């Protein structure tokens, strides 16, 4: 396997840190509000995103850091606030992945980053937007905010 540049190592570290942060945030929401959709589904998806990135660390023989985010993420006063934060995070996620994609020459890295960005924009963002709408329309916490079906990637959904 080709050696990665320092920039590409930094790309992988930044992407993994972002996915770790997302997972820890959604896990905290579940801790605070219970098993509520779309957080339960998207937390599972974030775990698959982490697995996809960890496979790249393995492919390039890099040591992956552990997730340092649990217990260090923002907490929200309501499920509506958490859903709104989810929208903002997924919007920002697209910009992050576009920036990271512009700096890598590795086709293996680019494929994974594109899939993660697309999952975020095509599934997570709409799920959080629906959740915001439903929370504003009556505080429906456990029904109707489902993420929807996802695509498969190497044995797991993204």
Model-identified regions with their sequence ranges:
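Non-heme di-metal
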Residues: 1-158
